[in-house]
């Protein structure tokens, strides 16, 4: 028996050491944690249970095979809640994916889905394992299939802590959220050398697919961190807002509160910018707002927060950037977030101060019509509780797109200063009273007078409230309490839709 035990411990040690002590040391010298260190830091203390540590490639020669085949898989807890996690081990074949490597990931994904718990992938891989040829590509296909199959069933989170190139990038792209470590995390389909050879363009890996690029330019990633530990801490925080799966909700007791500061945060002058995140923080429970994609499409803000201890998703116009107008990227950013919240029964709050869709030739030529329609589609198809708070401007088609009553909002509140109209009062007055303004002895004075007249008669919140497009006009300071009450009332909302296979969102 002792001989068997000794053999077991030897094999276990081999599995835990991955590519060996020398390669583990090299990993740390690059400022990177090892695969197992990452898992240990991410999960609750002593909660990780490994699965399939002794699996190895059945394709490579005996001399080439290594226990675990370059990926550590298993389950544990985060804040006491079950999660499933895999971590690619760069010290084994450079983390390259082969048949067995893929089988381990697929088995874990299936297990996570059966048990209705989130899955987290810690990516650090050189890509497909060339030695295994098409078997590696087939492995990617099986992973992609499960990413799609379990989308909306369990939360899927990707963490890019090293290279992620070629076909490997499509699995993270199919998941719900992507975190990236600065300096070490990189994603691209074709690397710098291939690009230079094919197109003649010269670029380094960081400028092509680093965390900064994907968080601010491409919009492929949602979060970044200076260190791996900062990134993994962010994953833990994100999960605290999410249900285990798309079939569970966790209602919490309501709490009333008054926030007088809200009376002073939004300038009365509709042309003056301000940071809507200050408004969000006053509406939400203290220190609960968790922004997503803060560096991409800054003219719209998305994120999670708690309202009376209940987790909600927030979509908000950001007047600090482009006056809060809707653009192609803003519409895409918000639409994807709305669909995630709907898939996992997370209520939605829309904080609106929108002057319209951004005018411009590039916006039109690049498809603002189609992209704006995605936002409309996402709001209209969502059946979770949906509440809108209009805090200043709500103009034109953008007003309709930002969760208006017409496309399915359950409740719409407006502040007394809100302006809800086909267009801004100045533009409307210029059209309606064009002849009168031109004939006036003082056109500028007449224009100001007509603008004020139009604003008073047509653009205030009372006209919309009289037509039933606004459910109530409320004071800024009472908004938090009213929103808590609204979401509490909507806790058991059910909404039947026509039966169909699926809609055709304008991709």
From Swiss-Prot:
Domain CoA carboxyltransferase C-terminal: 256-501
Biased composition (Basic and acidic residues): 1-25
Region (Carboxyltransferase): 1-501
Listed pathway(s): Metabolic intermediate metabolism; propanoyl-CoA degradation; succinyl-CoA from propanoyl-CoA: step 1/3
Region (Disordered): 1-30
GO CC term, one of those recorded: acetyl-CoA carboxylase complex
SUPFAM superfamilies xrefs: ClpP/crotonase (SSF52096)
Biological processes per GO annotation: fatty acid biosynthetic process
GO molecular function: acetyl-CoA carboxylase activity; ATP binding; propionyl-CoA carboxylase activity
Protein name per Swiss-Prot or TrEMBL: Putative propionyl-CoA carboxylase beta chain
